[in-house]
A protein has these predicted regions:
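Walker B catalytic acidic pair
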Residues: 137, 163-164
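Loop/turn-to-beta-strand initiation segments
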Residues: 131-132, 156-160
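Conserved coupling/interface region of RecA-like P-loop/ASCE motor cores
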Residues: 26, 167-174, 178-212
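Short glycine-/polar-rich loops that comprise or flank the Walker A/P-loop
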Residues: 8-11, 155-157, 186-191
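Short conserved AdoMet
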Residues: 6, 127, 153-154
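A mobile, often basic/glycine-rich helix-loop segment
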Residues: 17, 156, 175-176
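Accessory N-terminal region flanking or inserted into the helicase ATPase core
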Residues: 50-134, 143-148, 171, 178
Length: 212
C-alpha cells in the first residue's frame, strides 16, 4: 500500500499563483530573458500600484498605465481578456516592469496562459503530469484562473472541485458567479450536494441560511 510519504512525493499542493510561479521558474525564459531569474525574487504588486512606484512611474506611459488598469478591471468584472489584450499587457510588464524587478499579480497567471497557448509541448507536459486535479474553495476562482485550469485539463484528466457558492467571498476581485454550475455543464461532472451541515448543526440561524 502507498505510505503517506510515498503519496506525498506524487502530490503537488499549491494555489493558482503558486502553480504558475513553479511553471515560470521552468519555462518563463520562453517569453522573456528576465524570467530566467527566480520569479519569487521579483516585487509582486497590483496593477494599480505600478504608477505609485517612483522607479516605474518614470518608465510607464499614460497608455501603459491604462492598459494595466483595464486588465485589472476586466478580471474583477469577470470578463475574460482577449488574446490580444493579454499580449499587450504582458509586453508592458516584460519591457517596463521586469527590468526593474517588479511583476504584477495578474501577470504571474497571464504569463503562464501565454506560454501554454504558444508552446503546445509545455501544455501537453502539464496535462500529462497532472492526471488528477483537485481544487478546494473552487467558488473563489476568477476568470483567468479558470482559463488556466482549462488549459491543463485534457480529455483524460480526472477532476474534483469542492466549493460552496454561499461562501463565495471574492466576488469583488472577480470570482466567477456561476462557476460551480459552469463546470458541471462544461465537463459533464456529477454534482454531489451534502444534505447535512455538521458545522452549524447547533446554530439555528446559520442552519436557516443554509436551507435557503
Amino acid at each position: 500500500p502507498n505510505s503517506p510519504v510515498a503519496i506525498g512525493d506524487k502530490v503537488t499542493i499549491t494555489n493558482y499563483h503558486g502553480f504558475c510561479k513553479g511553471l515560470l521558474k521552468k519555462y518563463g525564459y520562453l517569453i522573456s530573458d528576465s524570467l530566467k531569474k527566480d520569479v519569487n525574487l521579483f516585487h509582486a504588486i497590483g496593477d494599480h500600484d505600478a504608477e505609485r512606484q517612483w522607479i516605474l512611474k518614470a518608465v510607464l506611459s499614460t497608455t501603459d498605465i491604462q492598459v494595466l488598469k483595464e486588465m485589472d478591471a476586466s478580471i474583477k468584472e469577470a470578463r475574460v481578456p482577449s488574446g490580444e489584450a493579454i499580449q499587450a499587457y504582458n509586453q508592458i510588464v516584460i519591457q517596463k516592469l521586469l527590468p526593474h524587478e517588479y511583476i504584477t499579480h495578474n501577470a504571474v497567471i497571464l504569463f503562464v496562459l501565454d506560454i501554454l497557448a504558444r508552446f503546445p509541448e509545455v501544455k501537453k507536459f502539464y496535462q500529462s503530469y497532472y492526471p488528477l486535479i483537485v481544487v478546494d474553495e473552487f467558488q473563489d476562482t476568477n476568470c483567468i484562473a479558470w482559463e488556466l485550469l482549462k488549459s491543463i485539463i485534457s480529455d483524460q484528466t480526472q477532476l474534483l472541485f469542492l466549493g460552496d457558492p454561499l461562501q463565495r467571498i471574492y466576488g469583488f476581485i472577480g470570482a466567477l458567479p456561476n462557476i460551480m454550475s459552469t463546470v458541471v455543464d462544461e465537463y459533464q461532472m456529477t454534482k454531489i450536494s451534502l444534505s447535512k451541515n455538521y458545522r452549524f448543526r447547533n446554530n439555528p440561524e446559520m442552519l436557516k441560511l443554509d436551507r435557503n
